[in-house]
């Protein structure tokens, strides 16, 4: 019978890498470790363990897992709760009431910011860090650059260089609070140097401090939920740029598989329909294409080979 060793929060053990190397050399057991990114990032494991490990990144709950944890059926209210409260497993121990859940999430958020970002990265301008995190949360799914943020801040009499903005954004990424999505040319898949998008790792952490206005935020939440779904399915996710300034919300690649996705709240008028379906129709290949929305009556249809899906159905693919 094989032997297993499980060690939680291994970064609290001084010199843990020496012990692990000795155990590896003895070949006496399979070792499973967890660590907080406050003091140990995955990029450092290769130094500590000389590459002799397999890393598993643990994400928050998917939508189906959220339903299962909370013993819910898929419904309009369940989807709203998912978009509002996010995917952290501990929420299973709390009533899904905004005041209670957001208080818990604010504590988690503060811990991440103070331990995983400020302490680890040696952040000196904490006020700016919090402002940048809030700005990123309010601009989920929007194209922006560090240079533009720096210029905006200077117009508000806040002197932060482009390099400082880049470093602070990277610190938020290193703490797994936000994720960067690169922009590519749809035709040639050339990666652009500027014009990235950022999405939160957890919707609840995005909402708890910024304040949630569902009517104002719904498009952002839909896009963030789609990104999380694709990431959990191990796709490499990009946003696409087409000729004439047209945009594809998501290009997702996994091995030889490619899918294109447009996201919107509802098909309110013909202009919206033309934008969402028209951009996908302009892509001349045979990879799957989706328009994802909250339309109840038209979701499930197929227009010129493009699948129109309700968000709840897409998140269960």
What would you call each of these model-derived segments?
Residues 17-33, 46-47:
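Conserved catalytic/switch belt of AAA+ P-loop NTPases
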Residues 36-38, 43-143, 179:
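Interdomain motor-coupling "hinge/lid" segment immediately C-terminal to the ATP-binding subdomain
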């Amino acid at each position: 019978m094989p032997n297993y060793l499980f060690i939680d929060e291994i970064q609290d053990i001084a010199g843990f890498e020496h012990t692990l190397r000795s155990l590896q050399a003895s070949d006496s057991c399979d070792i499973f470790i967890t660590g907080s990114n406050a003091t140990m990032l995955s990029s450092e494991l290769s130094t500590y363990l000389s590459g002799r490990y397999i890393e598993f990144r643990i994400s928050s709950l998917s939508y189906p897992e959220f339903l299962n944890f909370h013993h819910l059926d898929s419904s309009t209210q369940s989807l709203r709760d998912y978009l509002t409260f996010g995917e952290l497993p501990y929420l299973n121990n709390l009533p899904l009431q905004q005041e209670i859940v957001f208080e818990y999430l604010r504590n988690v958020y503060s811990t991440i910011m103070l331990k995983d970002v400020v302490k680890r990265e040696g952040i000196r301008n904490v006020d700016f860090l919090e402002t940048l995190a809030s700005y990123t949360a309010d601009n989920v799914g929007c194209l922006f650059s560090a240079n533009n943020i720096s210029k905006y801040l200077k117009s508000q009499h806040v002197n932060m260089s482009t390099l400082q903005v880049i470093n602070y954004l990277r610190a938020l990424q290193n703490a797994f609070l936000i994720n960067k999505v690169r922009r590519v040319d749809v035709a040639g898949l050339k990666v652009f140097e500027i014009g990235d998008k950022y999405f939160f790792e957890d919707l609840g952490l995005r909402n708890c401090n910024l304040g949630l206005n569902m009517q104002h935020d719904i498009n952002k939440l839909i896009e963030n939920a789609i990104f999380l779904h694709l990431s959990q399915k191990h796709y490499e996710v990009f946003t696409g740029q087409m000729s004439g300034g047209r945009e594809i919300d998501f290009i997702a690649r996994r091995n030889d598989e490619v899918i294109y996705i447009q996201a919107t709240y509802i098909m309110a008028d013909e202009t919206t329909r033309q934008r969402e379906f028209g951009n996908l129709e302009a892509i001349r290949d045979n990879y799957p294409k989706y328009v994802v929305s909250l339309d109840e009556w038209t979701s499930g249809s197929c227009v010129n080979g493009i699948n129109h899906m309700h968000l709840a159905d897409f998140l269960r693919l």
